[in-house]
Structures are given as C-alpha cells and as structure tokens.
From Swiss-Prot:
Keyword Ribonucleoprotein: yes
Gene3D superfamilies linked to this entry: Ribosomal protein S20
Gene Ontology molecular-function annotations: small ribosomal subunit rRNA binding; structural constituent of ribosome
Region (Disordered): 1-30
Signal peptide segment: none
Record organism: Treponema denticola (strain ATCC 35405 / DSM 14222 / CIP 103919 / JCM 8153 / KCTC 15104)
Protein name: Small ribosomal subunit protein bS20
GO biological process, one term: translation
Biased composition (Basic residues): 1-10
Cited HAMAP family: Ribosomal_bS20 (MF_00500)
Length: 89
C-alpha cells in the first residue's frame, strides 16, 4: 500500500473534524440558551449560562477550534447583551 500515510492523515483529520464540530455545536447551543434566557428576563439563569459560555469559548480558543480574537469578540458581545438587559435594572 503506497499511500498508507495519506490514509492515516485522512483518518486523523476526520477524528479532529468530528471533535471540533462537537465543541462548536456545544458553544452554539449554550449561546442560544443564553440569548433565550436574556430575552426571557431570567437574570440568574442568564448569569450562569454566561459563565458557562465564557468557559466554553476560552476552552475552544485554547484548543485552536476558535481563534482567540473570535472567542473574545463573542464573549464581549454576550456580556454587552447581559449588561444592556440587566445592569440598568
């Protein structure tokens, strides 16, 4: 088999793709739950989800799934949404 290393690299990339896809899906799901909690004016749940989302984004950035700036931008926007909804009240 001449292309054994190519087959191995392909298999490795598939494993990485599935792992990255799962992590990105987790982040998107938490972000959706967070925005729903903010729009429902549930401050306690939103605060807990914001902490969880921030942790997931940092983890994804550390693993190279998202870039550092992308994770920081998403965290900033979620914090702005939280502050606009609950800080004035």
């Amino acid at each position: 088999m001449k292309n054994r290393s190519a087959i191995k690299r392909h298999n490795q990339s598939e494993v990485r793709r599935m792992r990255n896809r799962s992590a990105k899906s987790e982040v998107r799901t938490t972000a959706r739950k967070y925005t729903e909690a903010v729009h429902a004016a549930n401050a306690e749940n939103a605060a807990a989800l914001l902490r969880e989302l921030s942790s997931q984004l940092d983890s994804a950035a550390r693993k190279g799934i998202l870039t550092k700036n992308s994770a920081a931008r998403k965290k900033s926007r979620m914090q702005l949404l939280y502050n606009a909804s609950f800080a004035a009240k």
